[in-house]
Amino acid sequence: MVSGLTVAEIRKLAGSRAGLDEDFLRALACDKRAGVAEIYRRLKRDENKMAAEAERLQKLYIYENSLIAQGYSPVAGVDEAGRGPLAGPVVAAAVILPPVADLALAGLNDSKKLNPSKRAELAARIKKVALAWSAGISTVEEIFNENIHAASLTAMRRAVLKLKIRPAYLLVDGYRISRLELPQLALTGGDGLSASVAAASILAKVLRDRLMDFYHVQYPQYGFNRHKGYATPEHLAALERYGPCPLHRAGYRPVKNCGSRQKCEG
């Protein structure tokens, strides 16, 4: 099967992943050429990695599969991003994934464990694979008026209500969502335990980061595009120098300690 091919031709074929069935791999294993042996070892390593990733993804569906087996379908995962920053809104997302683990979502994980480029890549894939997804936002004013916990729940509630498919059950990171008549399970560390919650955490984080990049254009002196509103030394120094702007959370102590909001209005 491969004896009539050069090592370069086999390498090109392996790179394209075309026709890489078990017969092809067995033929590579029997080929005595050193170059072919190296190609075979690389393909087997890749195969083993994909098998391990498929197993890891399947474990992330334990909660979803259990609920579906009990008759709850579809299941939505819900999470938020932006509880801790000194500036900007809190953003939530709700995601309904297909009931079967999909290697198109290889690398799916808690958004905090992924770098920005990986999060953006996965967010695009999640939107393609998901049966439904949506986002909800609570503004800086709502955070001030309600407190951050209540505002986070409001953002999550909005995300759920915007889903085009009504979920039968919710898996929520951290806390149950009040004033929502749907059965739900709050999972501590849910973005590392549930595929749909992990997907929601990624969408919420990517959307919020993009909003903060947009706000950076309006208020470049704070560096929102770098720290996304969190209390980094750069951000605290900018607050001390310029005072708060309308995006800052007036109820947060570091913001209150930096003087009048009027310094940066407009």
Swiss-Prot record:
One cellular-component annotation, GO: cytoplasm
Listed cofactors: Mn(2+); Mg(2+)
Binding site for a divalent metal cation: D79, E80, D173
Signal peptide: none
Reactions the enzyme catalyzes: Endonucleolytic cleavage to 5'-phosphomonoester
CDD domains for this protein: RNase_HII_bacteria_HII_like
Keywords: Cytoplasm, Endonuclease, Hydrolase, Manganese, Metal-binding, Nuclease
Superkingdom of origin: Bacteria
Locations listed in the record: Cytoplasm
Gene Ontology molecular function terms on file: manganese ion binding; RNA binding; RNA-DNA hybrid ribonuclease activity
Stored SUPFAM superfamilies: Ribonuclease H-like
Domain RNase H type-2 per the UniProt entry, residue ranges: 73-266
UniProt similarity note: Belongs to the RNase HII family.
NCBIfam families reported for this sequence: PRK00015.1-1, PRK00015.1-3
Protein name: Ribonuclease HII
